[in-house]
From Swiss-Prot:
Transmembrane segments: none annotated. PANTHER family: VIRGINIAMYCIN B LYASE (PTHR40274:SF3). Monomer. GO terms for biological process: antibiotic catabolic process; response to antibiotic. It comes from the Bacteria. One of its GO terms (cellular component) is outer membrane-bounded periplasmic space. Mg(2+) binds at residues 256, 273. InterPro entries: Streptogrm_lyase, Vgb, WD40/YVTN_repeat-like_dom_sf. Inactivates the type B streptogramin antibiotics by linearizing the lactone ring at the ester linkage, generating a free phenylglycine carboxylate and converting the threonyl moiety into 2-amino-butenoic acid. This is Virginiamycin B lyase. Keywords: Antibiotic resistance, Lyase, Magnesium, Metal-binding. It comes from Mycolicibacterium smegmatis (strain ATCC 700084 / mc(2)155).
Amino acid sequence: MSKALKVGLDGGPYALAAGPDGAMWVTLAHSGEIARVTETGEVAVYPVAPQARPSIIAAGPDGAMWFTRAGDDRIGRITVDGELAEFELAEGSAPFGIAAGPDDALWFTAMTSGEVCRISTDGEVTSVAVVGGMPSMITAGPDGAMWFTINQGNAIGRLETDGTLTVRELPTPAAGPVGITATHDDAVWFTEIGADQLGRIPLDEAIQELELPGKPHAVVADPDDGVWVSLWGADQLARVSGDGEVVTIDLPSGSEPHGLAIGPDGAAWVALECGFVLRMPN
């Protein structure tokens, strides 16, 4: 079993994703930067723009990392060598979630304009669906569609690459869904930060909900079974098995855990907005 690794990182670590280079790439929302963190804790920081507010980051099909810039309405791209590019969006769109799709493109949500959009690896942006309700995080589902949370619409959206949209309302009022991930059991899991619950949709079946106090924020699939969840309001991580068994891990007070990702070795990483990234033992 490997040991836990705690890496100090100023600038408000918010989200992170594993890159094709074996490192973890982190958005620094407060300072407007992107950081690269190796499995041994070595750090490199790349300035983007002070007002950019980098939010969610994902590995693209082109070998680069792509991220949303909610503060200045842009999509950013950074190569593993640190070369940056940006693609301007409509003013006030507030891009947030982003994920690689099955079509060799990136898909992202625009919270303020209420859109789900596609951006090709050469920067061509297409608005595919206008859903309203503040679409938040997005993931590629096991069925070839993009699934996303609609935070203020209290729903989960499913968008096929041809633009076919399905919206499913949540059974709990004002649940405030945020994080979302697809798992190897052909299901989609999501967090309900307003209801202190974790949701699961086995594709075409009924929505399932599990009580999970602590303001669950992000969720990521565990390669072995189940999911990891950041409990932002409780300064905890939760490990939830496929059959719903919950184990919580306490973090220091004031940690503000947000984004989660799985490293190349299967270990879970979490971004702590207080100024650290943490790699869990595996």
